[in-house]
Regions:
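Structured-RNA-binding interfaces characteristic of tRNA pseudouridine synthases
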Residues: 1-253
Length: 253
C-alpha cells in the first residue's frame, strides 16, 4: 500500500465545503469519485484543511492510500481527467505511509479579498466580498499588528468550535491594496473555525471607523465572540497554501 499526496486547487462556489455531506456536492466527494474511477479502488482522501462552503483554494493538501502502480507524479494528470473543471490537481507525489496532513507542524496561508467599489462587479461576485464606502487601510494595518503573535483567539472563532485549545500563533498579517481590491493575507500555525473570516470582518469595521485599532487588544483579552466584528462571507476567502515545516511530506524516491 502506498500513500499519495495531492495539491488541490478549486473554485468552491458550487460546493458545500470540503467534507462529504449527504446529498450535497463537496470537494472530498469529487476526489473520492475520481480516484475510484481511475484505480477501481474504494478509497477516501484525507484533507489538511476542511474548507467551508464557498471557500476556495490554490493549494489545499490531501492524501489517500492506494495499491495502484501508477507513479506518484502521474496522478496529477491522471486524476484531472476525471475531475470537474472547478477542481484541479496541481501536483502529486508519494509520501511516507505515516504522513498525515493534519497531524504535522504546518504554516497555512489564507487570503481574503474585498471589492471596495460603489457598485459590485458580477465577474468578481464569487471571489470577493463587496463593501461600499470609504475604508481606511492604514487603520486596518494598525489593528492587524495587534493580532500577530501567539494569542487566545476565542473572540475570533465560532462559538460552536470543538477545538481543545483556542490558542494560535499568527506569523504575519498584511493588509494590501490592489486597485479597487483590499487583500488581507494571513499566515499562521493553524486557524479556528471562521477565524480568518471574523478577523476580516473586524478589520473592515476598523477601516469603517466602527472600532478603534487598539480595541483589538481588548477583543483578544475578553475571549468573548460578541465583542469582535462580523463574520465576513465565505466567497472572498482562499486557502493559498500549506507549508510542512519539518518536511514530513518529503517525496518517497
Amino acid at each position: 500500500m502506498r500513500r499519495i499526496k495531492l495539491i488541490v486547487a478549486y473554485d468552491g462556489t458550487e460546493y458545500s465545503g470540503w467534507q462529504i455531506q449527504p446529498e450535497a456536492p463537496t470537494i472530498e466527494m469529487c476526489l473520492d469519485k475520481a480516484i475510484r474511477e481511475l484505480t477501481g479502488e474504494n478509497v477516501h482522501v484525507t484533507g489538511a484543511s476542511r474548507t467551508d462552503a464557498g471557500v476556495h483554494a490554490y493549494g489545499n493538501v490531501a492524501v489517500f492510500d492506494t495499491e495502484s502502480t501508477i507513479p506518484g507524479d502521474r496522478f496529477t494528470f491522471a486524476l484531472n481527467r476525471f475531475l470537474p473543471d472547478s477542481i484541479v490537481i496541481q501536483d502529486s507525489w508519494e509520501v511516507s505511509s505515516d504522513f498525515h496532513p493534519r497531524h504535522c507542524n504546518t504554516r497555512k496561508t489564507y487570503e481574503y479579498r474585498i471589492l471596495n467599489t460603489a457598485v459590485p462587479l458580477p465577474q468578481k461576485r464569487n471571489f470577493t466580498w463587496h463593501v461600499t464606502g470609504s475604508i481606511d487601510i492604514e487603520k486596518m494595518k494598525e489593528a492587524a499588528a495587534y493580532i500577530v503573535g501567539e494569542h487566545d483567539f476565542k473572540s475570533f472563532c465560532c462559538v460552536r468550535t470543538q477545538a481543545e485549545s483556542t490558542v494560535r500563533t499568527i506569523y504575519s498579517l498584511e493588509v494590501l491594496q490592489e486597485g479597487s481590491e483590499i487583500i488581507i493575507r494571513i499566515k499562521g500555525n493553524g486557524f479556528l473555525y471562521n477565524m480568518v473570516r471574523i478577523i476580516t470582518g473586524t478589520l473592515i469595521q476598523v477601516g469603517k471607523g466602527r472600532f478603534k485599532p487598539e480595541y483589538v487588544k481588548q477583543m483578544l483579552v475578553s475571549k468573548v465572540r460578541t465583542v469582535a466584528g462580523q463574520t465576513a462571507p465565505p466567497q472572498g476567502l482562499t486557502l493559498v497554501g500549506i507549508e510542512y515545516v519539518d518536511n514530513d511530506d518529503a517525496r518517497v524516491v
